[in-house]
Amino acid sequence: GHVPHEPIRSARESVEFQRPQHRRAATNRSVTASAAARVARGKWAEDLVSRWYQQHGYVIVARNWLCKRGELDVVACKDAVLVVCEVKARASNAFGTPAEAVTPAKQLKVRRATADFRQSLRASSDPIALLVNSARTVRFDVACVLGTQLEMLEDIF
């Protein structure tokens, strides 16, 4: 049989609609309700974890600290111990527990971001920087928020 070189089009169809740029431009780029709920849940969980640390005598040093190598959710300090906490929030266990989401790759990113965080404060005389620089130990915690329940896993990696 004969195979045409051009796609078969109706007389009213335009070639313009075949371009990939047009198809990409037509996608919906707005934030979905589920994405907005996820962001709100994450912020609520970070607020909950920050309050937990404060109630236990820690000073919150930083929240959502960003660098090229990652993000630190909550950084706190107490008794010369710098605590870096990765916060994982889930509405349910349907896709695994919050702790299971902290993979070895994520742990490495957090460790590298922590090194960048400490380096960024080395030369500073800011009171927070002095507190961070006086820390002799770094501890990595994971805060698991499932629904409204908080479980703290201290010194987990």
Model-derived features: where do they sit?
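Acidic-basic catalytic patches of nuclease active cores, encompassing PD-(D/E)XK
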Residues: 1-63
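Catalytic cores of nucleic-acid endonucleases
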Residues: 2, 16, 28, 89-148
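Conserved catalytic cores of phosphodiester-cleaving nucleases, focusing on short active-site segments
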Residues: 53, 72-98, 110
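Short acidic/glycine-enriched loop/turn segments that link adjacent beta-strands
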Residues: 67-70, 147-148
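Protein kinase-like catalytic core scaffold
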Residues: 81-83, 139-141, 151
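Short hydrophobic/aromatic patches at helix-to-coil boundaries
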Residues: 153-157
